[in-house]
Amino acid sequence: MDLNTRKILSLFASILFTIPVYIILHEGGHALIALSCGARITEFSILGAYMRYEGGTFTALTLSLFYIAGMLLPVLISIAYMLLYRDAAQSVFYRIFSFLFPLILTAPALAWGIVPLLYLSDQAPPGDDVTGFIESSGASPWAVLLGAVLLFAGCLFL
């Protein structure tokens, strides 16, 4: 198989693997906090990209953690992956996957930079994780925007 074909197949395989992994980590982040608050997970859908829970006792802090955990768990896993990256590896798949995996896992953090701006103009999507975080934590949308920019920039330079 020639190099270009291997690159294309590696690209598609990486995307097909990484997107479901991102969904599992994102929804898993929410689920971990819900479970730690005594909730019971009633649904966890990879294809629908959602999780549902019943019960649990949430404070303002744990509710804020619930909303941000969907973004933070994939970012933390991505950072760990980047730190463990083996530069000497020659596999085409490994190199393409190692480029896409952190990119796909951290790119949704950009929403944490966009939604605060929408929130400031009263156009934030209801039910969104960022909107829920701002409302439950009482954090300034500007602080959330700054945090998202710093986090994303830090991941780019890691």
Regions found by a protein language model. Give the residues of each.
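Short, Lys/Arg-rich, polar N-terminal cytosolic tail immediately upstream
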Residues: 1-5
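Small-residue-rich helix-interface/hinge motifs
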Residues: 7, 14-64
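Metalloprotease/metallohydrolase-associated module, dominated by Zn2+-dependent proteases
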Residues: 44, 52-158
